[in-house]
């Protein structure tokens, strides 16, 4: 029996749907490899002056790919280009171009201008963050999320979740890099943390509720979170005077986790994911208090001089909670329900992603320390040779502009 015309059209559309989905997945994975993984290696190279040339090569390759990526773009199943992907793609092209211009100029002047050198390093690290945003836009386009009324809610989850991840990354850097782990600055770590928390709280207090609309249950929840943030931040700043360590940033994590653990959602699975997010955040705050109170001496080093495995818990908890919160938006929770999965399966998958991300961050930090050690060794060897006497009275090596 021959298939009728409507059925044939439906089957053709279904085959096109699967082929289009396969190509989008390949495109996304390729973007992950080049715009995030490859670019993050280039960012590490950029932090050491003697490896700037390698970082520029990697950034040039990524820049060329970003142009191709923007031209290709992500297209949803209705045939029109997703505006967010197009916008982030164009922004990434100009951002890469800016970094390359500054990087080539910095290389030309041999890192002699500290402002240019520091600017290049900072922008090189921000490239990775831009790549992550680009990939997030790809997911939004592939799954057709965050359109219309869902846009604000997705943005809130994305921004807040990314903030937790960035905080976890910063704590990992401070923990692993020795010259940052030993606090010799004017202020303690908690002074910086409390200041950011205070500013964030002020912004949330006055932006979570529209004055011309009646107060809702969600408005009370989000505004109260903003109030506790700036109140805790101010107290933390006061307790940080004279480079004192204190518990307020960690206590803020615990209070935030407590509030989110009881944040009831429309879907049961969403309520459970939010609850687990809260538990993880509370655990991370408790681990931070234990670390500051019992594992660090007066010089902010571990008592035995080594990093204990317990100290990795807080950065990991922040990264995990950030990914959980980013993945707890309304439409993503509905997708999990439609797939027939439960909250435990989804949480385990998210936790696996957080572990891989933490692994990659720690690997990059170890790579940075190794490059720094190698660069210093090479410089020391060159300096020793440069001081040797030669029969012609001339030095065989010119290293006046060479710096780590």
Each predicted region: which residue ranges?
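Extracellular/lumenal N-termini and interhelical loops of multi-pass eukaryotic membrane proteins
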Residues: 1-18, 133-137, 325-336, 342
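N-terminal signal-anchor module of multipass membrane proteins
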Residues: 1-75, 95-96
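Membrane-proximal first intracellular loop
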Residues: 11-23, 46-56, 77-85, 109-123, ...
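Transmembrane-helix exit/juxtamembrane "anchor" motif
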Residues: 42-48, 101-109, 172-179, 234-244, ...
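Eukaryotic helix-linker segments that join adjacent hydrophobic helices
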Residues: 56-135
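Non-transmembrane, juxtamembrane loop and terminal tail segments
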Residues: 112-115, 126-129, 195, 253-255, ...
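Generic multipass alpha-helical transmembrane bundles of integral membrane proteins
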Residues: 131, 135-304
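C-terminal transmembrane module of eukaryotic multi-pass membrane proteins
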Residues: 287-294, 301-376
